Amino acid sequence: MSSDTEIRLAGEVRRRRTFAIISHPDAGKTTLTEKLLLFSGAIQIAGSVKARKATRHATSDWMEIEKQRGISVASSVMQMEYRDCVINLLDTPGHQDFSEDTYRVLTAVDAALMVIDAANGVEPQTRRLLQVCRARNTPILTFVNKMDREVKAPLDLFDEIERELGMSIVPFTWPVGMGKFFGGVLDLRRDQMRVFSPGEDRVKEGGDEVVEGLQNPALAERFGSPYMEAASEVELVREAAPGFDEAEFLAGRQTPMLFGSAINNFGVQEVLDALVELAPPPGAKAALQREVQPVEPKFSGVVFKIQANMDPAHRDRIAFLRVASGRFERGMRLKVARSGKELRPNTVVTFMSQRRELLDEAYAGDIIGIPNHGVLQLGDTLSEGESLQFTGLPFFAPEMFRSVEVADPLKTKQLRAGLTQLGEEGAIQVFRPVAGTVLLLGAVGQLQFEVVAHRLEHEYGVKARVMPARYNVARWVTCDDAKELQRFIDGNAHRVALDAVDAPTVLLEYAGELRAMQDNWPKIQFHALREHAGLVFQKQLQG
C-alpha cells in the first residue's frame, strides 16, 4: 500500500465516531436520536414520537409495531457528518425484553451516550446496560433529559448517578431551575449561560441565546433565585468533582454530564460537540487469532446484527456489519471465515433508519448493510482472505419459552421460513426438538413473543398460535468426547432441541433438574452463553 493510501486510510479512521444511545424506556432516547440527526443536518424536520398518531413517526422507530407502541424494539443505524467527522449512531432497543439485541449492538460501538430521565433518575434498564458498557470499558457520556419538567433536584441527581453507576461525574453544564422555571444551563467549560427557549421541529436560526460570564450580574437580575441556587451548587460540585481526565473517560471510569431538554432541541448541540471532541475513533478489535488494527490495509468486519424485512415489499434480510479494518469497496471479493464461502457484495448500503443509500466505500467504524439470503449469520467475520474470528458476540440462554403452531396447516412452510429469518436476527431463538415436531421459541421477555406473532402475521402472512411451554431453563451442551455427547442426546431426546445453528440445547422445567443432570453427566458441560455458530463461552453457571 502506498504512503498516500496509508495516510488517507489513517485520516478516514480518525474521522469516525461510532456510538450507541442507551437508556431506560421513555427516557427520551429516540427523541434525542432525532434531534442529533436534526442538528447534524442529516434531516430537516424531526418526526416526534408524540405525533405518532398523525402521519409522522420518529425517524429511527421504523418497524410497524414500534410505531404503534412508541418503543424501539429493533436497533436502528444512522450515519451523518458533523464538523468533519463521520458519525455512526446506533439507536438501541429501549425495552428490557430486547436487552440481548442491545448487548450485541454495544459490541459494535466505541462509545455510548447514556440518557437519563431527570424525573426518574437511574432506572433498572440503565443499570443493566451500563454494566455491559463497564465490562467492555466503553467510554460513556451522560445526558440528563427533560429539565423542562418538574424533576429531581440536580444535586440529588448528581449523587444518585455517581452512587448508582459507580463512576465519577464531571458536569460540563449545570441547570438553572426546572419545569416552568427552567432558564437554561451554565456551561462550566465555556464560562457562559445558554438560555432556554422552547424549541420546535427545526433548529433555531442563530442557535441558543448566550450570556457570557457565569458571574455576570445580569444573570442574577434576569433569573433571580434559580440562578443564585445554581451558582452555589456549581461551587459545591466543582469542589467535589474531579476535573475532566481523558484517560479516565476513555477507560469508562469517568463520565461527562450535560443537562437539557431533547424535545425542545436544548442541550443537543452540546452533546453532539462533546461526542465529536471526546469519543474515541475506532480502536483495535480482538479476534481468536490476533488483534486487528483499524488502519491495517486489508478489509475485515463482523456481522453484529441481522434484520429481516426492513423493506417488507422485498422480504429482505440485511446483515449489519461493523468494519474493523481496511477499506471496503463495492464488489470486492470477501471470504466468510465460518463457511469459507466467497461473497462479492455489490448492493451494499448505508442507513438513515429504514432509508438506504448505496455506498461505494467504508472504513473502520462504519456500519454497512449487506443484503443476505442465509449466507451470513450473527457473529460472522468477513475478510479479504485471512481466516479471522472476532470474539465477544454472545447469545444468552432464554428464560421464557413458548410453543408455536400455525392456525392454517397449509402455511407451515411460511411459518418455518418466517421463524428462520426472525431467528437469524437474534431477537428470538428458535428450537427444533430432537423428538417432536412442534417448534419452540425462547426469549428473555414476554414482549419478544408478541413482536414475533405480530411480525409473522404482518410480514409473512402467517397467523400463528403462540402457547405456553413447560420449560423454564435452557443450557447449551458440549463435551470433549463426541460419543459421550451423542449418548447424552440419545438418552435425553425428549428434553434436547437444536437451535438455529444446530447447537444442542437441553430444555428443563426447574433449576433442580439442571443440578441433577450435572451430577449424572459429569463429562457434559452446560452453558448459559454461547458464541455464534455453536461455539460456547467456557463459562458454566451454577443452577
Residue ranges and their predicted role:
Residues 1-543:
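Structural and coupling elements of P-loop NTPases
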